[in-house]
Regions:
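NUDIX/MutT-family hydrolases
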Residues: 157-176
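Active-site-adjacent beta-strand/loop module that shapes the phosphate/pyrophosphate-binding cleft
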Residues: 35-40, 133-154
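Conserved Nudix-box catalytic region and its N-terminal flanking loop in Nudix hydrolases
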Residues: 50-53, 67-111, 153-162
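A short coil-to-beta-strand element that immediately follows conserved catalytic motifs
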Residues: 16, 120-127
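Conserved hydrophobic/aromatic beta-strand scaffold that supports enzyme active sites
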Residues: 30-32, 73, 143-145
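Acidic, metal-coordinating catalytic segment for phosphate/diphosphate chemistry
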Residues: 23-68, 82
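N-terminal presequences and immediately downstream first alpha-helices
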Residues: 1-35
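Acidic pyrophosphate-coordinating catalytic loop
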Residues: 21-26, 42, 82-83, 130-142
Length: 176
């Protein structure tokens, strides 16, 4: 690999939004954009239409008990997995979307940990911030590892029968 910068050469000024419509507004929103953008040869491309699934920022946490050497995952039904997996119940990190103005990602995750798993998180460390699928959504996701006492973890939390807690033990401690 060459010694090139990983910073893209283009920015927002290199995109021209010609039209933006909102054909769907529900719990989430879908926008249809007609836009054009610069090409690597320096010229502007022809207008294209793109659908954008508009989502608030999201955050997730991997609860980790360094004393017990365990992590916690939440099992929940997910409609998005209905057609792509053997089962639409997924083992996941505790996660949520920002639904309160001004709530930080860390505060969001502390709230979700209580709501989804009855957990109080201690020290939290950020481990990633990324856009999971920027070709079709503007969602931004921040991921943390959070120390927690998982000794009494387990059961069903959140809405009735919404989340089942699963703890997994490791043979050695993780670096967090």
């Amino acid at each position: 690999m060459s010694n090139q910068s990983l910073t893209p050469p283009f920015g927002p000024q290199d995109v021209e939004v010609l039209e933006r419509e909102t054909p769907f507004q529900g719990f989430f929103r879908v926008d249809t954009l007609t836009l054009r953008h610069k090409h690597y040869n320096g010229g502007w491309g022809e207008p294209v239409r793109r659908e954008l699934f508009v989502r608030p920022p999201a955050a997730a946490v991997l609860p980790y008990d360094p004393v017990r050497g365990e992590i916690l995952l939440v099992e929940q039904f997910r409609v998005g997995a209905l057609e792509w997996r053997d089962t639409p119940w997924c083992l996941e990190l505790i996660a949520g979307i920002a639904d309160k103005d001004g709530e930080s990602a860390a505060d969001l995750i502390r709230r979700e940990a209580v709501e989804e798993a009855g957990l109080t998180l201690g020290t939290m460390e950020p481990i990633a911030a990324y856009m999971p699928s920027p070709g079709g959504t503007n969602e931004r996701l921040q991921v943390f590892v959070g120390h927690a006492d998982l000794a009494g973890a387990g059961g069903i939390f959140g809405c009735p029968d919404e989340a089942l807690i699963a703890c997994c033990r490791f043979r050695r401690n993780l670096p967090w």
